[in-house]
Curated annotation (Swiss-Prot):
Name by which UniProt lists this protein: Wolframin
Localization per record: Membrane; Endoplasmic reticulum; Mitochondrion
TM ranges: 238-258, 259-279, 285-305, 347-367, 373-393, 446-466, 473-493, 513-533, 545-565, 572-592
Biased composition (Acidic residues): 169-179
Tissues expressing the protein: Detected in adult brain.
Gene3D superfamilies: Tetratricopeptide repeat domain
GO MF, one example: ubiquitin protein ligase binding
Sugar-modified residues: N694, N769
Matches recorded under InterPro entries: TPR-like_helical_dom_sf, Wolframin_Cys-rich, Wolframin_EF-hand, Wolframin_fam, Wolframin_OB_fold, Wolframin_Sel1-like_rpt
Membrane topology: Multi-pass membrane protein
Region (Disordered): 139-179
UniProt cross-references to Pfam families, sorted A to Z: WC-rich, WCOB, WEF-hand, WSLR
Source organism of this protein record: Drosophila melanogaster (Fruit fly)
Amino acid sequence: MATWTQNEPTGVTKRRRWNLEDRASLNKLKHHIAEEGCPQMQYDLAKELLDNSIVEPNLAKGNQSQKAVNWLVSAAHNGHEDAVKLLRQCYNDGSGITAENTDEVRRCLAMTPGERAARKAARELFACLSNGNEHITPKQLERKMRRIYNLQRKRRRRDDDRSSSSSEGEQEPECEPLEDVPTIDLANVERRRLITEAHLVSAASNYSAGQMPSVNDALTLSVPDPRSLDHVPCFYRMIFHPLIFFTLFYHRLLNLIVSIPNVIPLSVRCSVLVAISWWSSRHMLPLVSYYLSLGIMIWATCKMLKTKQQFVDFRIWSGLFLSYGDQNIEADIAEHRFLRNNMKPYLYFFCAFICNLIVYPLVTDAWLPHSELTIISGALTFITMCVSMYASSHQLPDWLVIVSFAVNVLAKYPYEMDEVVSTRWRFLDLRVPTFSSFVIGNGIEFCLNCRTALYLFIPVLLIMMAKRSRWHGVYTFLIPHCVTLSWLQVCIATSQSSTVFGVMRAALGLAGIVLFLPLFGIVALLVPVFVAIDSLGLASEQLRWGSTALACGLVVVLSCILALNRATQKYITMLQLITAITTACLLVLPYMTSSFKDTPRFNAMPRAGLHSLSETNTLPWDRFHALCAQPVHEQPNKIKAQLRCSLLNGMPVIWEGSVTKVEISRVSNFLEDTIANYLPVWLGRMLRCLHGENISQHFKCDPKLDAQCEEWRSVFKTFNAQSGSCTLQRWNRYEYELLVKVGTKRSGRLLGRSTTTDVILRAHHDFGNFTRLLSEGDVVLFYGILHNSRLLADNVQVKLKTIECVECRSRDLGTASIERVVAASPMDARLQDLMRGIKYLLNALLNPLITFK
């Protein structure tokens, strides 16, 4: 017991003091306070146990150190930094560290101060919301987070001082009881997942690591609830709740596009890539690469937009932990980690963007829907710009993003292709050169003008973005803004080949996709009105228009009343569909039962023949015969003429001749070669029947026209009965050889010698349909390139590019042509395509300062 003692008077008055005769009561009080969660008391007890200031009779010395470590771990979890330092010292010395607590000590020491503070805030939050229960509901947590977020927005908007902010915070209830279970709807109970303290502590750890807490999947913080419009009929959701409708549509579209790689299995993706590698030719490869890179760009952009929406949720979590934590909460560091952890879609985007720019000049314009691509890229440009303008927590948009976008538009806009700007808006004519241009090297031009000045101002703006927040603005502002500028470049490139009607068509198509349900609902409402008015047979046009407007207004009002009524809103959609389909059938049925005459709307378009080609760039037959054919034929020593004529290889020619012989010179089948050389027999037989067809089915003939048709069929029937083999001949790639006699017999008679020479035309697989219909004696006009001209060959060889029938027996023969780049080898052609793509990429990045021609 404590008693008062008084010292003897010595002339100086001293303080009275307590004499604690029983210190066990004080130790019990300390233990009780420490068990209640006081970090300072836990630290003091641990320090006294380590210093042997407290001797507990029931514990040995080793167990006493172990208990001190347990107190230090508890104090460290509660945010006591001195306890962390002492715990680290104990771990290094091995004092109190056992096999049971070593893992827990390591995890505690591995945590950052911010993570420990966040975990402490999570425990306090759960204790506040649970009121002693073992769990809380997502609705409680969501309501608390929304309340704190709205309060922080009001504080930022009003810019109040701390005292007023704290007074406002005191008005908010800190703790709230659990919901009354009987009042909760059964459907909500089934879909709701209860949250325990372990869930919140795990969420705090994920938050500190810059990862979205898994608990966030059960919450709807920055987006409306997906079921918020389920009580409204489908056709009336945009009419009654337009903002929620478009918001839900936006987020559902993002989720759909983002989930595409997860929906398509990996085996299917690999099979598609293998098929593309097999079937893609040199001209198909750029087309496939373009659309593949464009799809990756769209997917990566949607993934970025999804990350931006998640970042808003992450900031709400920051506000939650800041409101319940202390000064050790590292909200800025956690947010920067979250942005860095989600940089992978940006890498995919820029790689696909570079590939898209490289292959764009290699793709034929006929294979690209420029107007649709312009609308899509333009929409993504403005969406990404609007999202990046509000990357910070400020209410006003980021002025630097707007200025940078405007400067890029002024610098990259194709003024020379816009008639309105070039003829009327002379004050925007930035193409006037103010400095002289300089030619640097082969095909590189350095020029300075007003657009160049704007272009040089762009890096300054980008550096200003990157310098924000101690260079954290690189991934907060700069990289998202570069995505906007990339889509702007795609929009400008595709808009140069688009048309006004094409852009209108694409815009209406995009609007139709977004507004399909509302438009269909309006049509379903108005079709019965049109049928009813049409059945009345009103003669007066004014009466007809007035009755139509009145009936439409009544129908719309009546349908809205039925949609708002709870008793009828479940059946209004089905009733509307049935009525619309019935009335549409009544309108269409008379026209379907009538007979129509199909008249051609368009005449056959005339085709330009080979006669329209210029002969200035080609080698005429008379000159070739005089230089090569005649000397090689007449001179006994042909070496000199052969060497000279070999220099003509690659020169284009346009000649006319008579067909003498047509045959197949070469057959290639990549699939058959792979199966025959690299696969076992049983697997090869299976793949031949899977990808090919039966020989008897492949062989087709007409007994009336072919006398040996029946004999061939019997042979194949017997062969199939014995082996059951299949063929892959439909995968064959043929090269044809046409022997054509070129020359003029009339001039030969006058000169006393013949000027005709046999020329071999080597035709590509694409000429198969044309060559099969040729007959001996047909006169053709062909365009091609000389190949191995009179060198190591008996006849002149020409690689066929275009052939036109002049006098042929078959009436189906016209003109056949292939478009191929003249190059020394396929590898040279691919290198030329690659150089064109790289020049286009460099022009997109450096033009107009440096131009690669």
